[in-house]
């Protein structure tokens, strides 16, 4: 997926679990544009993961074996925490 195709990335952010939408959609909306190109590619790679894995990782019930994916999970968690709650 092209890092500049925001419509397609936005669609990929929409998950089957409300809990994931609450974490991923605000991060995309408020933070994606400020990411480096490498981190944008990493975020897109994270979106290819299965919903149950994403849910567990974002809820701190385990972590991905891939350290770069883990770094992106932590970035999402930290930026969402710093920003505070927003409407989805």
Curated annotation (Swiss-Prot):
It holds the Pfam family Sdh5. Its main location: cytoplasm. One of its GO terms (biological process) is succinate metabolic process. Keywords: Chaperone, Cytoplasm. It is found in: Cytoplasm. SUPFAM superfamilies: YgfY-like (SSF109910). The keyword Chaperone applies. GO terms for cellular component: cytoplasm. Gene3D superfamilies: Flavinator of succinate dehydrogenase. Monomer. An FAD assembly protein, which accelerates covalent attachment of the cofactor into other proteins. Plays an essential role in the assembly of succinate dehydrogenase (SDH, respiratory complex II), an enzyme complex that is a component of both the tricarboxylic acid cycle and the electron transport chain, and which couples the oxidation of succinate to fumarate with the reduction of ubiquinone (coenzyme Q) to ubiquinol. Required for flavinylation (covalent attachment of FAD) of the flavoprotein subunit SdhA of SDH and other flavinylated proteins as well. Belongs to the SdhE FAD assembly factor family. This is FAD assembly factor SdhE. It comes from Photorhabdus laumondii subsp. laumondii (strain DSM 15139 / CIP 105565 / TT01) (Photorhabdus luminescens subsp. laumondii). The lineage of its organism: Bacteria, Pseudomonadati, Pseudomonadota, Gammaproteobacteria, Enterobacterales. The gene is sdhE.
